[in-house]
């Protein structure tokens, strides 16, 4: 039996053993542990209880307790001989943001409040963002994936040109890239890792929402490795708190254009974002704090206080605002969830 993040607790002859799966310790003998005395009209039962390491949760049809039957099989009354699984916890950072702080002039993330934030280096060394959504998959933008590639490039062409880091500069290998089938209007792609990452306080996925957290005025946090006020890529992860903006005002600000990269007279940055039913805007007009080049692919993270869980309400697509264009543009996570789950299941 082997499972990432799993621990088995065994009660044998009255002695409790904790066995970490993967350590080749399936046979346990302890001569110093005597067999418990028999009792009238009773018997001794051998039990195992499956538990998970910190930052993992047990997924099982039963209670995780298995007994040894007459055929020498470990079985559970509800699950039979089907073993439980340890799944990665999402959206539960050990050191969540605890300040209302306003990644141009944003704050440094000294505590590891955004363990889902990944750094992706594209072809020719450009820094972009990606967001861990499971222990083996990340979301980023299709535009990030196509940086310095032609429009004719395929997912197989792109994957070998990317370098990806999670946690404190932990290099991870990429197995494949999957592009959204409507990437011209839904600026999203998925990255699958060759191996599952071990979830820790420094590396943890963020949850995808089942309900919509996007409403004007709703505050969210965006972290990133993008350019700073000096237009240089930051060496340390930074974050900023921004409100969801009124969609109509945002569209008016960008001349209501839905044509990507179309130059306009009003747009302060000379290009237009993709704006449609799959996107929302966030940003401030009175402060210097903002996302900037290189932050795309990062999550608009919101905290559900009732569940005490962090969700990715969106993924930053248009990161060229840089405290000049007022609004960054995000792809709605609720519009992605079905496609993401189907893609991960198929691959």
From Swiss-Prot:
Subcellular compartments: Secreted
CDD domains xrefs: CCP, Tryp_SPc
Domain Sushi: 31-88
GO cellular component: blood microparticle; extracellular space; haptoglobin-hemoglobin complex
Cited InterPro entries: Haptoglobin (IPR008292), Peptidase_S1_PA (IPR009003), Peptidase_S1_PA_chymotrypsin (IPR043504), Peptidase_S1A (IPR001314), Sushi/SCR/CCP_sf (IPR035976), Sushi_SCR_CCP_dom (IPR000436), Trypsin_dom (IPR001254)
Keyword Acetylation carried by entry: no
Residues linked to a glycan: 148, 152
Range of residues in the leader sequence: 1-18
Domain Peptidase S1: 103-345
UniProt KW keywords: Acute phase, Antibiotic, Antimicrobial, Antioxidant, Disulfide bond, Glycoprotein, Hemoglobin-binding, Immunity, Secreted, Serine protease homolog, Signal, Sushi
Tissues expressed in: Expressed by the liver and secreted in plasma.
GO molecular function, one term: identical protein binding
Pfam families in the record: Trypsin
GO biological process: acute-phase response; animal organ regeneration; defense response to bacterium; immune system process; liver development; negative regulation of hydrogen peroxide catabolic process; Notch signaling pathway; response to bacterium
Subunit structure: Tetramer of two alpha and two beta chains; disulfide-linked. The hemoglobin/haptoglobin complex is composed of a haptoglobin dimer bound to two hemoglobin alpha-beta dimers. Interacts with CD163. Interacts with ERGIC3.
Free-text comment about domains: The beta chain mediates most of the interactions with both subunits of hemoglobin, while the alpha chain forms the homodimeric interface.
Function of the molecule: As a result of hemolysis, hemoglobin is found to accumulate in the kidney and is secreted in the urine. Haptoglobin captures, and combines with free plasma hemoglobin to allow hepatic recycling of heme iron and to prevent kidney damage. Haptoglobin also acts as an antioxidant, has antibacterial activity and plays a role in modulating many aspects of the acute phase response. Hemoglobin/haptoglobin complexes are rapidly cleared by the macrophage CD163 scavenger receptor expressed on the surface of liver Kupfer cells through an endocytic lysosomal degradation pathway.
Family of the protein in this entry: Belongs to the peptidase S1 family.
Alphabetized PANTHER family for the sequence: COMPLEMENT COMPONENT 1, S SUBCOMPONENT-RELATED, HAPTOGLOBIN-RELATED PROTEIN
Entry protein name: Haptoglobin
Taxonomic source organism: Rattus norvegicus
């Amino acid at each position: 039996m082997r499972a990432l993040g799993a621990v088995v607790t065994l009660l044998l002859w009255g002695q409790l053993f904790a066995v970490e799966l993967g350590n080749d310790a399936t046979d346990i003998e302890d001569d110093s542990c005597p067999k418990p005395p028999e009792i009238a009209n009773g018997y001794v039962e051998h039990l195992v209880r499956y538990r998970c390491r910190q930052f993992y949760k047990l997924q099982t049809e039963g209670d995780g307790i298995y007994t040894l039957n007459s055929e020498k099989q470990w079985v559970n009354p509800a699950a039979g001989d089907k073993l439980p699984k340890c799944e990665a916890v999402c959206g539960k950072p050990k050191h969540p943001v605890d300040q209302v702080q306003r990644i141009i002039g944003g704050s440094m993330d000294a505590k590891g409040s955004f363990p889902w934030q990944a750094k992706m280096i594209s072809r020719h060394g450009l820094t972009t963002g990606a967001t861990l959504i499971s222990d083996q998959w990340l979301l980023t933008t299709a535009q990030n994936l196509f940086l310095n590639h032609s429009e004719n490039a395929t997912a197989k062409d792109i994957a070998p040109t990317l370098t990806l880091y999670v946690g404190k500069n932990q290099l991870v290998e990429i197995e494949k890239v999957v592009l959204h089938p409507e990437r011209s209007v839904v600026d999203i792609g998925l990255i699958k890792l060759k191996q599952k990452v071990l979830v820790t306080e420094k590396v943890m996925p963020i949850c995808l929402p089942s309900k919509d957290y996007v409403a004007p005025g709703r505050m969210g946090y965006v972290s990133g490795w993008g350019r700073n006020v000096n237009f240089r890529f930051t060496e340390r992860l930074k974050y900023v708190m921004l409100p969801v903006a009124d969609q109509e005002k945002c569209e008016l600000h960008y001349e209501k254009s839905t044509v990507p990269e179309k130059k306009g007279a009003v747009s302060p940055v000379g290009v237009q974002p993709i704006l449609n039913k799959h996107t929302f805007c966030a940003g401030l007009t009175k402060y210097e704090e903002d996302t900037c080049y290189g932050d795309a692919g990062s999550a608009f993270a919101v905290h559900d206080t009732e569940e005490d869980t962090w969700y990715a309400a969106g993924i930053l697509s248009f990161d060229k605002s840089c405290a000049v264009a007022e609004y960054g543009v995000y792809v709605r996570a609720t519009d992605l969830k079905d496609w993401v789950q189907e893609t991960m299941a198929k691959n």
